[in-house]
C-alpha cells in the first residue's frame, strides 16, 4: 500500500506562523485536536512544533509559553514521505528517526501529517484481514478470496 492511500484529501494541514508564541501554537493544537503543527514563514515550511517540543523544550526548561516564540523551540523536518512511498518505507522513516509524526510532501508542499498510530492501525487491520482469510481457508471455505 502507498502513502497516498492514507492521505486525507479533505484535510488541510494546520500551521502556525514562525513568529507566534508557544501559547498560540498550543491553543491552535487544542482547537484543531492535533498534536503537531507545521511552522511556516510566508507560506514556506520552516519546521514542526509538537506536544513533545512543548514538554521537553518549554515546560522542562521553565520557559513561559506566552513569551517563547515557536521558532525557538520548533523541530526541524528530518524526514518526510512522498505520496508514492510505500507504507513500509514511511514506517521505516518513523522508526529510523524515532518520530511519531511524518510529513507527507508533494511538490514541495506538506499535504498531510501521518502519525505512527495511523500506520500501525492500518497494519493491524491488514493483519486481521489476512488472519481471517487464512482461518477461512484452513477451515475449508476455499471460496474465500485470498488477499492480493
Predicted regions and their residues:
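A glycine-centered beta-loop-beta connector
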Residues: 29-32, 37-53, 94, 102-119
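Tandem CBS (Bateman) regulatory domains
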Residues: 1-12, 50-80, 86-95, 116-148
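The conserved cystathionine-beta-synthase
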Residues: 15-33, 40, 80-98, 105
Amino acid at each position: 500500500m502507498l502513502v497516498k492511500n492514507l492521505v486525507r484529501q479533505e484535510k488541510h494541514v494546520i500551521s502556525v506562523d514562525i513568529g507566534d508564541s508557544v501559547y498560540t501554537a498550543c491553543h491552535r493544537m487544542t482547537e484543531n485536536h492535533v498534536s503537531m503543527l507545521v511552522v511556516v514563514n510566508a507560506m514556506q515550511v520552516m519546521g514542526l512544533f509538537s506536544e513533545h517540543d512543548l514538554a521537553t523544550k518549554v515546560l522542562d526548561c521553565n520557559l513561559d509559553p506566552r513569551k517563547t516564540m515557536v521558532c525557538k523551540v520548533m523541530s526541524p523536518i528530518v524526514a518526510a514521505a512522498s505520496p508514492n512511498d510505500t507504507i513500509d518505507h514511511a514506517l521505516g522513516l518513523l522508526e529510523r528517526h524515532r518520530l511519531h509524526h511524518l510529513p507527507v510532501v508533494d511538490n514541495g508542499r506538506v499535504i498531510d501529517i501521518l502519525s505512527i498510530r495511523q500506520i500501525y492501525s492500518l497494519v493491524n487491520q491488514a493483519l486481521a484481514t489476512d488472519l481471517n482469510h487464512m482461518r477461512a481457508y484452513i477451515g475449508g471455505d476455499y471460496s474465500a478470496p485470498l488477499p492480493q
